[in-house]
């Protein structure tokens, strides 16, 4: 059996990691071992924060809806309860967008929610 020298494969693997570490500070960008650790840690942060981003956006939408609803004398939780009782199924992302860009339509939704609460 012939001898397998891994120089080409190893070099390609190192090059791939160094390329991913482009823009990092200090040795992290050009020393393979530290670059490898930095790239792996970056991947862990990215994985974690892709999930955190979903929570952050939901919280932002809720804050925007709450601000819009309070202008009409209602709280967020009462508004959501009113929408559910009125049978209006609109998600928070859309409600947030309506509250910002279409105040008249949002006011109509608030009035429907208030009517359903009574």
From Swiss-Prot:
Annotated GO biological process: ribosomal large subunit assembly; translation
InterPro entries assigned to the protein according to its UniProt record, in alphabetical order: Ribosomal_bL20 (IPR005813), RIBOSOMAL_L20_CS (IPR049946), Ribosomal_protein_bL20_C (IPR035566)
GO molecular function, one term: structural constituent of ribosome
Keyword Cytoplasm: no
Keywords, sorted A to Z: Ribonucleoprotein, Ribosomal protein, RNA-binding, rRNA-binding
UniProt keyword Lipid biosynthesis present: no
GO cellular component, one term: ribonucleoprotein complex
Biological role: Binds directly to 23S ribosomal RNA and is necessary for the in vitro assembly process of the 50S ribosomal subunit. It is not involved in the protein synthesizing functions of that subunit.
Listed HAMAP family: Ribosomal_bL20
Family stated for the protein in its record: Belongs to the bacterial ribosomal protein bL20 family.
Family annotation (NCBIfam families): rplT_bact (TIGR01032)
Official protein name in the record: Large ribosomal subunit protein bL20
Organism name: Parvibaculum lavamentivorans (strain DS-1 / DSM 13023 / NCIMB 13966)
């Amino acid at each position: 059996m012939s001898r397998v020298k891994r120089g080409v494969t190893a070099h390609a693997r190192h090059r791939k990691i160094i390329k991913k570490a482009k823009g990092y500070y200090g040795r992290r960008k050009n020393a393979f071992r530290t670059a490898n650790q930095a790239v792996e840690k970056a991947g862990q942060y990215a994985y974690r924060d892709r999930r955190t981003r979903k929570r952050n956006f939901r919280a932002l939408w809720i804050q925007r809806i709450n601000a819009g609803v309070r202008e009409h004398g209602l709280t967020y939780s009462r508004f959501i309860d009113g929408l559910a009782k009125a049978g209006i199924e609109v998600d928070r992302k859309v409600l947030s967008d309506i509250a910002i860009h279409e105040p008249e339509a949002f006011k109509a939704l608030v009035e429907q929610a208030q009517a359903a609460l009574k």
